[in-house]
Amino acid sequence: FSGGALVTVIVNSSFMKFFTDVIGISPALYGLVFLIFSIWNGINDPIIGYWADKQPYRTGKGKYLPLIRWAITVIGIPVIMLLFTSPGWNDVVTVIFLLIFMVIYEGGQTLLNVSFMAFTVNTFLSTKERTQVTMIGSYLNMLPAFLGGMIPIWFFTGDFSRMQLIGVFTGAILLGLFLTWIGQFSVREDETFYHALQVTSGL
């Protein structure tokens, strides 16, 4: 699921400059939106984690895999929609638009993360196995995270139009979603995993 890291880094490292320099809202307004977004991030993690944990295992579909697949769409649509914010909108409309879609995006990102974490805990029951999987995932995240961090350096420092920037960021986000979609094929759920359910509650 390293593609999710690419999208996260783009949102965290590029969106402020995009909205302040390209769209034209003030850094203070963007900071206010990000503050509300951060508060929502802290609130929604246990709520979505609890909800995901209570989902039943569906024969032929799984418990967390359907949530992971759904989360990919929930992440992608709002982030790409935000790139098409118009510089001609007034600040109030822009802030409301930004806040709504950032909240939706964060919900999808949380659903993806807690579902994969819970799947990992329930599938790899020993601490050693979970540690190995976590370490491998951390290494795999490095390249997409590096790419996401370099994109603003490459493209915000040049003479690129708004539409060119939209094209670049849309392509990078779609790449991240594609990598995440490929990654979900590695998830193999067995109903017997959940007979020995361990500590997913509250993730």
Q: What residue spans do the PLM features occupy?
A:
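Membrane-embedded alpha-helical bundles of multi-pass transporters/translocases
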Residues: 1-203
